[in-house]
Amino acid sequence: MDMGLFDFSIGANIILSAIVGCQLATTFELGYFGLVVGSIATGALVGLCNGFFYVKLRIPSMIVTAGLALIYESIANYMAGGVEQTLPSSLRALGQMPGNIILAVITFIIAYGILNYTKFGTYTYAIGSDEFVAKNMGINVDKFKVLAFILSGAFFGAMAVLTISYGSSMVAVTG
């Protein structure tokens, strides 16, 4: 992250997000809506948990996210029932050309726009450059750190969509 934080729960976030998205798309028959929205929302929720525990407990982000990764993998394994989650072929368009390129370009444009044209992006770079100065300038550093974890989690959710669509299946112990 641009703030100097480390997130070691990326793999677990992708696994959990992919399994939730796959279950929403297949079990609840929500199709692409369930796959995309479910995966991105789950990724953002995982990011919220990471950010909350990091900010409130004041434990280094490496330790918090490494520990939470084990919890996320356990939740994913429990949700999947220990079996492989398979995405039907009718929902795999985002894992093949040109769907995967379109999704990747959309996420790149969103990330670029957020980091270069919003107050959040400016504050992110300010906190990454010097957290002490940013705090003295009146930036609520803790709030923006949590938001950074949420945003990165949402992008990991988008990666989960690509992963499950390309591979067509996910096992909770893949990562």
What are these regions (language model features)?
Residues E29-A69:
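Alpha-helical transmembrane segments within multi-pass membrane transporters and channels
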Residues M1-F28, Y54:
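Single transmembrane alpha-helix segments in multi-pass membrane proteins
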Residues F6, G157-T174:
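Non-cytoplasmic
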Residues A12-L16, Y32-A41, I63, I101-I106, ...:
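Hydrophobic alpha-helical transmembrane segments
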Residues Q23, F28, L48-K56, M79, ...:
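Membrane-interface helix caps of multi-pass small-molecule transporters
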Residues V141-F156:
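Start (N-cap) of specific transmembrane helices in multi-pass transporter permeases
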Residues L57-F120, F144-L147, Y166-G175:
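Transmembrane helix-bundle core of multi-pass membrane transporters
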